[in-house]
Structures are given as C-alpha cells and as structure tokens.
C-alpha cells in the first residue's frame, strides 16, 4: 500500500465515522451541488422489488426507494452513518450495521443490490462473492462507482495535470470488470451522461444456475 492509499484510507475512516455529520456538506461541495442527483440516477437500473443497499450513508437513496414502495433494506459499517440514516428515515427504516464482506441475509434473498460511490470494499472478492450469494438468479449488482462533473474549473485542472477523465474511466472500468468476472458476474459498464456530469455505472448480472 503506497502513501496515497494510506492517506485515503485514513481520510475515509475519519469521514465515515467521527466526521460523518459533515458528509452531506462535503459531498455537495465536491460535486458542485449534484451529489444527490447522481445517487438517484442509479434508480432506473434497479430491477425487482426486493432491494439491498450496501453502504447506505445518510440514507438519501433509502428514502426514495421506500417512498416508491420497494422492499428495501440497507447496511453500513459506520454506526454514525446509521444514526444519520435513522433520523432521516424514521420508523420506516430497515437498516442493519455490518460489513459488506459478511452480508447477514439468506441466499438468493434480493432482486437487486445497489451501492453508490463505495470505498475500496467494493473491490474485495469477499464482498462480490457475498453479493453473488444473496442475489436471486438474474439478479443485479449495480454500482455507481465514480462521477466527473462538467465544470470549467475541472477542465482547466485536467489540462494542467495532463490527465483526462477518459484515462481514469478506462482504468476503473478495467479493474471492475476483472473483479466482477472473478465473482462470476456477467458485467456491463455504462457511462451515463447527465446534465451535470458523466457517471460510471457497473452492472453485474448473476446468471441463472445451470443445475
């Protein structure tokens, strides 16, 4: 693990735990006010009615899914995030605390699993294996992995650094495809263009058992 990776791990640990109360403000700032819209953009990819969200954060997506009448449950490792989400959802919440590497639900329990802007746990083979286990045949694992805002400041920054969003996209797409394939998902990667930016969505489909 290099120095940058160590720094990011420490940063996210602080961000999701003692400083979880700053999540909405920070997310809105780095996305130029588009964070929630980006999160909601994953909804059209969801199939079925029994949904699991990995890493629910402060509960914005859960609120929408429950309001739409879906049987949605969610889990997050962070206790502070659970507190924020419970405040938002009230008595309607179906939240549990736990690790994505040890999903506490039965085999083939869900039609779709969603995760928006997850940290490195989503690349863990144990996470992907667990997701595969709890999905029904033809179920979907849908991950909103990254977003690139359409903002003049960022365009200038990419010119200065000599990098481009397309370089980052290809690197992330390659990494996710390899991870999903190892977990026996049929994988599709989409770049979703919205008014405020470009979103990278990875969809892993659990193919029907041949048995």
Where are these regions (language model features)?
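Core SAM-dependent methyltransferase catalytic element
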Residues: 184-185, 189-211
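A short acidic, Gly/Pro-enriched loop at the edge of an enzyme's catalytic core
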Residues: 101-112
């Amino acid at each position: 693990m290099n120095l940058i990776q160590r720094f990011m791990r420490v940063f996210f640990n602080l961000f999701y735990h003692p400083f979880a109360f700053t999540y909405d403000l920070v997310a809105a700032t780095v996305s130029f006010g588009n964070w929630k819209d980006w999160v909601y953009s994953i909804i059209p990819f969801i199939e079925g009615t029994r949904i699991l969200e990995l890493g629910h954060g402060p509960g914005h997506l859960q609120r929408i899914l429950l309001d739409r009448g879906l049987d949605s449950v969610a889990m997050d490792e962070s206790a502070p995030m659970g507190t924020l989400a419970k405040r938002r959802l009230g008595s309607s919440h179906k939240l549990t605390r736990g690790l994505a590497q040890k999903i506490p639900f039965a085999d083939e329990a869900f039609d779709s699993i969603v995760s928006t802007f997850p940290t490195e746990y989503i690349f863990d083979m144990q996470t992907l294996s667990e997701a595969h286990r709890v999905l029904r045949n033809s179920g979907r694992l849908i991950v909103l992995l990254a977003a690139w805002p359409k903002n003049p400041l960022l365009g200038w920054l990419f010119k200065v650094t000599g990098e481009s969003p397309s370089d980052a996209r290809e690197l992330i797409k390659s990494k996710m495809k390899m991870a999903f394939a190892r977990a026996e998902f049929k994988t599709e990667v989409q770049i979703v263009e919205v008014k405020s930016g470009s979103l990278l969505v990875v969809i892993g489909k659990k193919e029907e058992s041949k048995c």
